[in-house]
UniProtKB/Swiss-Prot annotation:
It is found in: Cytoplasm. This is Histidine--tRNA ligase. The keyword S-adenosyl-L-methionine does not apply. Homodimer. One of its GO terms (molecular function) is histidine-tRNA ligase activity. InterPro entries: aa-tRNA-synth_II (IPR006195), aa-tRNA-synth_II/BPL/LPL (IPR045864), Anticodon-bd (IPR004154), Anticodon-bd_dom_sf (IPR036621), His-tRNA-ligase (IPR015807), HisRS-like_core (IPR041715), HisRS/HisZ (IPR004516), HisRS_anticodon (IPR033656). GO terms for biological process: histidyl-tRNA aminoacylation. GO terms for cellular component: cytoplasm. It comes from Haemophilus ducreyi (strain 35000HP / ATCC 700724). Its EC number is 6.1.1.21.
Amino acid sequence: MAKTIQAIRGMNDCATTESPLWQWVESNVRNVLASYGYSEVRMPIVESTPLFARAIGEVTDVVSKEMYTFWDNDEQLTLRPEGTAGCVRAAIQHGWIYNNEQRLWYMGPMFRHERPQKGRYRQFHQAGVEVFGIANPEIDAELILLTARLWQALGIEQHLSLQLNSIGSLAARANYRAALVDFLANHTALMNDEEKERLVKNPLRILDTKNQALQAVLNDAPKLLDYLDEESRQHFAQLCQLLDAMGIRYEVNPKLVRGLDYYNKTVFEWVTSALGSQGTVCGGGRYDGLVEQLGGHATQGVGFAIGLERLVLLVQEVNKTMSLPKAVDIYLVYAGDNTTLKAFQIAEQIRNALPQLRVMTHCSGGNFKKQFKRADKVEAKIALVIGESELATQTIVLKELQNSSEQISIDQADLLAELSKRF
């Protein structure tokens, strides 16, 4: 027997038992985004490698350690590790944002070469939102309100908390970076090799270290909020006022900086304690310089991304008894000469008249007992049975499979009316 081939480590299959929950979560995401007037876009999963190096930053962990990159003839390509850079590239290329506001969303797989663990995978999925051309803090607030509404729709609002910060302008961060490096230079004995490298290349990333001893020292470090430029300070104050007025609870976290270099001003994360160490379910912020950095006209930007694997895990964790719609409403059971055509005709009539119903035709042969076992396996609600006697009398047997043992025989002409009453 030939050796079987397994999925790549950290890249997972989604089974039929799992996909209904994924579909339900994704449907809620789409519905909430539509209710705010956002439009879907779709981008390639492969982009030119320099796009991510320029957008995310060459000294970030994502670009320096985690990207899947390969050569195609003389061009270096990368499986996208996140969605913002590709969305900005597409917006510039196709003129979506030239003198124009846009509120966009996308959903799909991303790829990072990380150590796989619960809630962190090498292929993972994100729902991302990007808004272009709006400078004021009202749009920052709208994105946070949008995510809060999604948590309510999913029944997880009590298990997520909002962390908020402002990282100011590029100049403000440069001043803060210098002060932070001066402070940390006296504590290098507490750092491992990776943290020492970050101190040189990207010192703000040390603020979210998992090193407990270093975290204790950072409590006395200079605070980024103290170095904000006046415009960023006012922007952040107005955002906080809006959130207060709308009843959104949040914690100002002065150590929150996000892991990508393109952010400025507002940054935020929705976090949970229900998933262990992988507690960030949604993160985002402003990137007002990114469009120009990638060759477009100066255009303000703000957005967020939701990790769908973590979102699905959280829904499972806090709603252990939730019941999702079954995959099949009606199962067509038929046996005997000439019953196949009639079963197919009836199935298509139901689909035409009641398109919301999920109708499965058996197709596999066998006796009635075998077919009913299959109907039970797919958890169908109702079986419709056609045998030679039903064919001769133009009747059909309707049998309840879930909530009762009811079984009735009705005229085929009355079937659609009967199903309309039951569904």
